[in-house]
């Protein structure tokens, strides 16, 4: 009976020996000695055991041991036995000082019963403030093999990982006189690439190192000056690599008041390459210099309206953006880090179509757009936002990542609608059209009904031409006063298969709850994994079993723990 101790003061400590924990008068846990606090203070000792079952590892049990080393240091050591794979040891160490902090995790399976190999995973994060504007960080991850997460992790957040970063940074941020700032960053970076045998990928370039310098200076005789620059040594075992210097100085004239703005801008993007020679050839040097001109402008109109028995402010925000960049053939340049950016409402007001520095798109384009928002007068909260935009190509696009493809003059159209239609219904929708070819490029549509905590229904649809077409449905719904249904599905209409699914029930009896959940997700091409979660949670005391909360929150947006008062 947990009611009596849980109603006592939160600082109450319990110390006892030969303790038997009973649930419904059934003894299920014997503790030769027990010492813990309801107030949440950290104490050294064993935590509640974790029980579970997965398709790839079999039945498993973990018994974490928590070591409260000092107020700013602690460690958790977790023996984890898996019936199909053997005994694994997990270790987590955390530390914090006034100017630094970090976390080290190291898991090892000395002799996997299936692969007959030692499996391990390590992750180290460290952040430090060095003073006078300087800071540094270290992030290192490595696993023993490409199947480590697919075989031993219980979450799609891990099994979907491909490139594990191994990097160190040092950065400086400071003022540049009055109304100015300066940011300098040093990055050394490489990755461990986890390969899927049925869909191998090329590993990213190493940056050994990358130096970045960005500076801004505002209101210099009415002008704003910006500088974006970086110098990078790219290294790769199989692809041509070398050095790249990128400079983009620009100057703009910001003219702005309460009802509108106009901002002309001119800049010059210069890139220099010093490339290493492939076998049997000479080293290569290349340069590219392109001017970039843009004009951004917009107006703001407002009016008071009465809707749904409430007072609102409705805005009308027309905006026009023009950009011009001349064409230059760039097939002779390497592509270290450029990729085409997703077409979105924010991106249509960008000068650049490609990320990175290796491809600078040609452009002679006008963007016309209008946004309207409905804002609650009393709170200032945005209730509904609607936006439409059209990017008009005055000349054909000649530069693409896939040469020699070109895009004719024409227009792209985008529309978005989002907001809280009623106090309990949220919606988010968008569509992108290629008006040249009368094709629908992308669609997203979603609606969420959330009338109260513990009661939510989400329905979503996503489409990208020639890439994917998917439906997402998820819910947390009460069946009775104490029982709740839990379900989610991510289904590919294009491939006619289930990509991820979750099904379970939750029972809440005020001071304890029980969760039974099955979670299936894709781990690799044509491979899936199923994890079964069984958790008994005794409120403020302990929980036994594999915790499914993270999987439920990922699979069911808006999921609420109903046993938290």
Regions found by a protein language model. Name each.
Residues 8-11, 15, 19-565:
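Outer-membrane beta-barrel proteins and related beta-barrel translocases across Gram-negative bacteria
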Residues 1-2:
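Short, exposed "boundary/linker" segments that immediately precede the start
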């Amino acid at each position: 009976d947990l009611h009596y101790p849980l109603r006592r003061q939160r600082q109450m400590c319990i110390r006892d020996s030969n303790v038997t924990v009973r649930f419904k008068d059934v003894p299920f846990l014997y503790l030769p000695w027990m010492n813990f606090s309801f107030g949440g203070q950290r104490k050294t000792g064993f935590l509640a055991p974790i029980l579970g079952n997965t398709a790839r590892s079999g039945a498993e049990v973990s018994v974490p041991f928590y070591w409260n080393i000092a107020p700013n240091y602690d460690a958790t050591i977790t023996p984890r036995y898996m019936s199909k794979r053997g005994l694994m040891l997990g270790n987590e160490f955390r530390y914090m000082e006034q100017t630094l902090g970090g976390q080290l995790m190291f898991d090892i399976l000395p002799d996997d019963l299936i692969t007959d190999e030692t499996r391990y995973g390590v992750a180290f994060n460290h952040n430090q403030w060095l003073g006078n504007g300087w800071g540094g960080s270290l992030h290192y991850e490595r696993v023993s093999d490409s199947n480590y997460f697919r075989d031993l992790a219980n979450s799609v957040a891990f099994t979907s990982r491909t490139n594990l970063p191994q990097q160190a940074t040092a950065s400086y941020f400071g003022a540049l006189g009055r109304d100015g700032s300066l940011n300098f960053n040093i990055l050394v970076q490489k990755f461990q690439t986890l390969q899927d045998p049925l869909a191998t990928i090329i590993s990213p370039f190493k940056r050994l190192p990358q130096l970045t310098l960005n500076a801004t200076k505002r209101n210099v005789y009415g002008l704003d000056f910006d500088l974006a620059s970086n110098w990078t040594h790219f290294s790769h075992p199989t692809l041509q690599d070398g050095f790249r210097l990128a400079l983009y100085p620009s100057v703009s004239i910001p003219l702005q008041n309460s009802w509108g703005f106009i901002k002309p801008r001119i800049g010059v993007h210069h890139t220099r390459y010093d490339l290493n020679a492939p076998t049997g050839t000479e080293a290569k040097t290349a340069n590219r210099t392109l001017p970039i001109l843009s004009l951004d402008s917009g107006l703001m109109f407002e009016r008071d309206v009465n809707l749904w028995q409430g007072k609102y402010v409705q805005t009308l925000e027309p905006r026009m953006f023009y950009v011009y960049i001349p064409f230059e053939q760039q097939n002779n340049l390497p592509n270290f880090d450029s990729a085409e950016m997703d077409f979105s409402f924010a991106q249509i007001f960008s000068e650049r179509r490609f990320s990175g520095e290796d491809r600078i798109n040609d452009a002679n384009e006008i963007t016309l757009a209008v946004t309207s928002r409905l804002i609650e007068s009393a709170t200032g909260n945005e209730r509904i936002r609607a936006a439409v935009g059209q990017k008009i190509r005055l000349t054909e696009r000649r530069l693409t990542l896939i040469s020699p493809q070109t895009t004719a003059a024409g227009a792209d159209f985008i529309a978005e609608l989002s907001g809280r239609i009623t106090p309990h219904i949220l919606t988010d929708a968008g569509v992108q059209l290629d008006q040249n070819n009368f094709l629908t490029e992308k669609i997203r549509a979603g609606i969420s009904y959330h009338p109260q905590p513990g009661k939510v229904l989400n329905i979503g649809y996503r489409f990208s031409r020639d890439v994917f077409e998917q439906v997402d449905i998820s819910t947390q719904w009460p069946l009775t006063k104490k029982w709740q249904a839990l379900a989610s599905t991510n289904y590919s209409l294009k491939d006619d298969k289930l990509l991820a699914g979750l099904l379970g029930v939750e029972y809440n009896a005020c001071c304890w709850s029980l969760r039974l959940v099955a979670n299936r997700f894709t781990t690799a091409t044509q491979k899936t994994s199923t994890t079964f979660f069984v958790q008994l949670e005794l409120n403020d005391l302990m929980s036994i079993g594999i915790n499914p909360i993270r999987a439920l929150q990922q699979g069911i947006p808006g999921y609420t723990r109903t046993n938290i008062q």
